[in-house]
Regions:
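A short glycine-rich, Lys/Arg-flanked "PGG" loop and its adjoining helix->strand segment in the class I
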Residues: 103-115
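Short alpha-helix
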Residues: 135-150
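Core SAM-dependent methyltransferase catalytic element
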Residues: 160-177
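A short SAM/SAH-binding and catalytic strip from SAM-dependent methyltransferases
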Residues: 88-102
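Conserved beta-strand signature within the Rossmann-like core of class I S-adenosyl-L-methionine
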Residues: 116-124
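A short acidic, Gly/Pro-enriched loop at the edge of an enzyme's catalytic core
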Residues: 79-90
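Conserved alpha-helix/loop element of class I SAM-dependent methyltransferases that forms part
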Residues: 1-19, 33
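Class I SAM-dependent methyltransferase SAM/SAH-binding core
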Residues: 21, 27-80
């Protein structure tokens, strides 16, 4: 996938300016796509355990947008409590598949969102994984799971081919509880 694919997976969500987090941001592929869509007046909290990946993200953000203002880097495990403001939206791109108990992690991230806040999920569209993608979930599985964690029924946004595990999908669900 390239930057255009990342943007195109998020674009159908029609996000507006606000306060967002990219949980499991890594080196920032989807953080950069999110920034392109929500603009420089939005605040983005990029959360990842890997400090060096966050440093790469910061450099890439500065190179692309000539600023790191309103980009807040947090070196932390998002499955633990975080000090974040109420969020308008969360991006979880290829981070949910690291958790076996997905309902538990979804309930956890649910608490970071404002009422009606958006959860954008990007995942491999398969239910069986490998050592690098241990617990993926198809859109159909996610569609069933998300409402049990306090979200609306997810809406499929887009799909792009994957060289490794068939395809990626993006979906949006909203905090309802």
């Amino acid at each position: 996938m390239d930057h255009n694919d990342h943007v195109n997976l998020l674009r159908p969500a029609n996000l507006s300016s606000g306060i967002y987090a990219d949980l499991g941001a890594g080196s920032g592929a989807f953080t950069l796509a999110l920034r392109e869509l929500v603009g420089l007046d939005s605040t983005i909290h990029a959360v990842d355990r890997d400090k060096s990946a966050l440093q790469e993200l910061e450099k890439a953000h500065r190179a692309r947008f000539h600023s790191t203002e309103r980009l807040l880097l947090l070196s932390s495990d998002f499955s633990h409590p975080l000090s974040l403001p109420p969020l308008d939206g969360i991006v979880m791109a290829n981070s949910l598949h690291f958790f076996k108990d997905k309902e538990k992690i979804l309930r956890h991230v649910h608490e970071f969102l404002k009422p009606n806040g958006a959860l954008l999920t990007i995942e491999y569209n398969v239910d069986s994984g490998n050592m690098w993608v241990p617990h993926p979930l198809t859109f159909e599985t996610y569609h069933t799971l998300a409402p049990h964690a306090g979200f609306s029924e997810p809406r499929l946004l887009a799909k792009v081919p994957s060289r490794f595990l068939r395809e990626f999908y993006s979906a949006i669900a909203y905090r309802i509880e």
